[in-house]
From Swiss-Prot:
Gene deletion effect: Cells lacking this gene loss their ability to grow on t4LHyp as a sole carbon source.
Protein origin, superkingdom: Bacteria
Organism of derivation: Cereibacter sphaeroides (strain ATCC 17023 / DSM 158 / JCM 6121 / CCUG 31486 / LMG 2827 / NBRC 12203 / NCIMB 8253 / ATH 2.4.1.) (Rhodobacter sphaeroides)
EC number(s) on file: 5.1.1.8
InterPro entries from the UniProt entry: Pro_racemase_fam
Protein name, per record: 4-hydroxyproline 2-epimerase
UniProt-listed SUPFAM superfamilies: Diaminopimelate epimerase-like
Keywords from the named record: Isomerase
GO molecular function: 4-hydroxyproline epimerase activity
Reaction catalysed by this enzyme: trans-4-hydroxy-L-proline = cis-4-hydroxy-D-proline
EC class (word): isomerase
Residues at which substrate binds: G92, H93, D252, G257, T258
Length: 337
């Protein structure tokens, strides 16, 4: 065995959804934008994504982020989100977790007021997080996400075994195909994970056939990667219960941060909620929630959009210093699907 590379990471979870924060070891090009940093990673360090997200260090549902230096004084840090298959434009559960981890581990200076503000550069745009802390305790993160909007409504498709359904295409930091399961027999619960994953991938392909995806102002954003199933909540006080199916069929354990942003835009467009009306969202596990609110309107080019905020908590799981032998194909990462 010959150790070729060593990388330090922090592990967290946000209402059950994991995050591997890669904060050292990558020599990002000086002065590069976040898109240039992602291209650099794709070309030179995609092996690291695979090694940390996949087995034997990760698993099929692992999620991660490269915490990068800022590209300008307008930002405090950059975030490039990853999983075992690909890259994501943004991630809300990850933003909650990485912001809390940065404050807890001294990766950012704490504001004496007890509320530390962190400006993140993502490939979806500027995301501003506020982390509340008291003494040694880090309490919660609230972030203002990129603007959200509804791109298309009532996209008809057939879901095998569950009949004809409709989806809305909504941007909330990623594009989501949002599907109402009320009236079907499919329930959102951990014991139904395999079926939810399978149906999510089928639904995503059906929606992709029906609509062209293109962000109004960001030319590089043109993909539908997430499908959200929702129905009535099981936790009192929540507006809905949902699960987000993404990438190779992963299931988000948390209520979803970009997902909560998209769901608020979805419900606002349908007249269910209004601006400045707080909501609570429930995730797959039925144990944790996020708080959300649309704090105003804006535009994306000529398209009306809303400004979502999401609040949640994350827990520290531990740290690791990984050695990686790229000459060993198993050590370099594999998936069993």
């Amino acid at each position: 065995m010959r150790v070729q590379d060593v990388y330090n990471v922090i592990y967290t979870h946000t209402e059950g959804e994991p995050l591997c924060i890669i904060y050292s070891g990558v020599p990002y090009p000086a002065g590069s934008t976040i898109l240039e940093k992602r291209a650099f990673l794709e070309e030179n360090y995609d092996w690291l994504r695979k090694a940390l997200m996949r087995e034997p260090r990760g698993h099929a549902d692992m999620f991660g982020v490269f915490l990068t230096p800022p590209s300008s004084r307008d930002y405090d840090a950059g975030l490039i989100y990853i999983d075992g298959k690909e890259y994501s434009h943004m991630c809300g559960h990850g933003t909650i977790a990485v912001a809390m981890a940065m404050v807890a581990n001294g990766l950012v200076a704490r504001d004496p007021s007890g509320l530390t503000r962190i400006r993140f550069e993502t490939t979806a745009g500027l995301v501003v997080a506020e982390v509340a802390h008291e003494g040694d305790r880090v309490l919660w993160t609230r972030f203002e996400n990129v603007p959200a909007y509804v791109a298309a409504q009532d996209i008809a498709f057939e879901l095998p075994g569950y009949g004809p359904l409709k989806a809305d295409l909504v941007w909330g930091g990623n594009y989501f195909g949002i599907i109402d399961l009320r009236g079907t027999s499919l329930r959102i619960a951990p014991e139904n994970g395999s079926e939810l994953s399978r149906m999510g991938l089928i639904a995503r392909e059906e929606i992709r056939k029906k609509v062209k995806v293109q962000h109004p102002t960001e030319a590089h954003i043109n993909n539908l990667n997430f499908v959200t199933f929702w129905h009535e909540p099981t936790i009192e006080g929540c507006l809905y219960k949902n699960v987000h199916v993404f990438s190779a069929g992963q299931l988000d354990r948390s209520p979803g941060g970009t997902g909560t942003s998209a769901m608020m835009a979805y419900f606002e467009a349908r007249g269910v909620i209004g601006l400045n009306q707080p909501i609570t969202s429930e995730g797959l596990l039925g144990s944790g929630t996020f708080e959300g609110c649309l704090i105003g309107e804006t535009t994306l080019g000529t398209v009306r959009a809303v400004r979502p905020t999401v609040k949640g908590t994350a827990g520290m799981l531990g740290t690791a210093s990984w050695t990686i032998n790229r000459e060993d194909p198993v050590d370099a990462g594999f998936l069993v699907l």
